[in-house]
Amino acid sequence: KESPAKKFQRQHMDPDSSSSNSSNYCNLMMSRRNMTQGRCKPVNTFVHESLADVQAVCSQINVNCKNGQTNCYQSNSTMHITDCRQTGSSKYPNCAYKASQEQKHIIVACEGNPPVPVHFDASV
C-alpha cells in the first residue's frame, strides 16, 4: 500500500518541470498521477522544487492546519507551484483543468520521525 509520504510525492511533487500556466500540463499530470480515477480531484497543487527542499519545510514555521491540527509547517521562502483546478464544465471521466502558476509559501502537514510531508494544506 502507498504510504502517506509516497502519496504526497505522487500528488504534489514535480521537481523536474517549471511551473506552468498551461492547462495541458494539468490535464496531463492529473491523469498521469492517478488523480482522475473514479472521480476528478477538484483542486491539486504541484510543487516545482526539490524533494529535499520540500521535506525541509517540516522543520520551518509551525502553523495550525486548516482542520485545526498543529502539525502543519509553512515554508520560509516562496516556492514555484502550479495550481490545477477542475473547470466548471468538465465532468468525470473527461476531467479538465485550468492551471495557474504561482510563487507562494507552501503549508504542509508533516508526520513521522524524521518528519516528512504527508498532506498539502495551503499556499499563502
UniProtKB/Swiss-Prot annotation:
Residues 1-15 have a biased composition (Basic and acidic residues). Substrate binds at K7, R10, K41, P42, V43, N44, T45, K66, R85. GO terms for biological process: defense response to Gram-positive bacterium. It is found in: Secreted. PANTHER family: RIBONUCLEASE, RIBONUCLEASE PANCREATIC. Endonuclease that catalyzes the cleavage of RNA on the 3' side of pyrimidine nucleotides. Acts on single-stranded and double-stranded RNA. This is Ribonuclease pancreatic. The lineage of its organism: Eukaryota, Metazoa, Chordata, Craniata, Vertebrata.
